[in-house]
Design a protein with these regions (language model features):
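Residue-level preference for the first positions of well-ordered beta-strands
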Residues: 43-45, 132, 168-170
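A short, basic N-terminal segment
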Residues: 1-40, 198-199, 203-210
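P-loop NTPase Walker A phosphate-binding motif
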Residues: 56-70, 85-92
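Walker A/P-loop nucleotide-binding motif
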Residues: 41-58
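Conserved nucleotide-sensing/catalytic segment adjacent to the nucleotide-binding pocket
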Residues: 82-87, 94-163
Length: 210
């Protein structure tokens, strides 16, 4: 399911076509494992160079979770009408229930999040409190902004807040872990290390292959 959504998103973005290589398929397997295993950390960090599929993958994950949630609703309706699940369906249903209570993921760039903190506090708070949030392009935003003369750190504050509640968060970034530590500090780096599973995107940019 995830691979299908990823292929569609690649085609929609006109990024040179889907590269069906081992590196891409390995990442798809790792992310599928994060989605299906109950033993993984609640959040996910997708990091690596520019233009190698991180944002596209984040959108594919969001589409996959939407589909899983819709499937969970259909199963609930079937059970209400007396349908008995097969052993295979019961196993799948455990996965569906994991995401069945989550709303559609909110997807926002880190730069937009920083802008909201300064110009639209109400929306900023709502986004920060979302049950499932995808922050795209961490590191492209100003680390701190001034709101009525008060200096705030919008993305750092969101990461702290979501760490405290262990809310599901996906972050994409061109920064490596050392860069994250240097830019945001050790406390943010430690929280990401503790609460996020990490998947590196190491291929060259797809944008140069058009």
């Amino acid at each position: 399911m995830l691979k299908g959504f990823y292929i569609n998103d690649v085609q929609d973005r006109n990024s040179g076509g889907f590269q069906d290589d081992e590196d891409t398929n390995k990442r798809l397997r790792m992310i599928s494992g994060w989605l299906t295993s109950g033993k993984n950390r609640p959040s996910l960090l997708l990091y690596g160079g520019v233009g190698n599929g991180k944002t596209t993958m984040a959108h594919a994950i969001a589409s996959t979770i939407d589909a899983l949630r819709d499937s969970a609703r259909q199963v609930e309706k079937s059970k209400a009408y007396g349908y008995t699940l097969t052993p295979e369906e019961k196993e799948e249903y455990c996965l569906l229930r994991k995401f069945g209570t989550l709303p559609s993921p909110k997807i926002i760039t880190a730069q937009k999040l920083a802008w909201m903190a300064k110009n639209d506090e109400e929306t900023y708070r709502k986004v920060a409190e979302a049950k499932f949030l995808i922050i795209d392009d961490l590191g492209c935003e100003p680390v701190s902004v001034k709101n009525y003369g008060t200096e705030i750190t919008p993305v750092t504050d969101v990461i702290y807040q979501r760490y405290e509640t262990m809310s599901t968060t996906i972050v994409t970034t061109n920064l490596d872990k050392k860069d994250i530590c240097n830019l945001y500090g050790l406390r943010v780096s430690d929280r990401i290390e503790e609460a996020y599973d990490s998947i590196a995107f190491t291929k060259d940019s797809y944008r140069t292959k058009r």
